[in-house]
Amino acid sequence: FNMKKQALQINTWGKNVYVKIPVVNSKGVFMGKIIKELNNKNIKLNITAVYTAKQTQRILKSINKKSKVIVSIFAGRAGDVGKDPVPEIKKSIALSKKFKNVEILWASVREPYNYIQAKQLGCHIITVPPSIIEKIEKFGKSFEQLTKETVRGFLIDSKKSKFKI
């Protein structure tokens, strides 16, 4: 079976390597069997493309409480289709509490506020692109500061346009 073979190969790359396994295959079939098999071989796993607490629950039923597992919940992509990822992540964190070897990851950050949401929920890991990190560094500005900066930006834009009335 190709995915298993690839996972075993990737695992040889180093001690800190986590092997990514999708929660389902391209046909939508849950990958519980391969997750269980690799987990029992003490291979560190990152179960990816997770969206629901129900999927997290199925993953938890397939693993032991020793081998390290990251459950990557695609919060940003859920938001992209109008779904609130927060309840699913909250439930997933609660379900995984008894598993000291499991970490919940907030994947596909779309805006700086996601960082605050992930932190408040108790996510163990959040993947943040550089463009969002730059914005997070601006946290703490007052609304008054933001207003002035915004209006200054409007002034600069209007001067650049050379538009006269």
Regions from the language model: what does each represent?
Residues 23, 126-127, 162-164:
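Short amphipathic alpha-helical segments with coiled-coil-like heptad repeat character
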Residues 13, 156-164:
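A charged N-terminal "starter" segment
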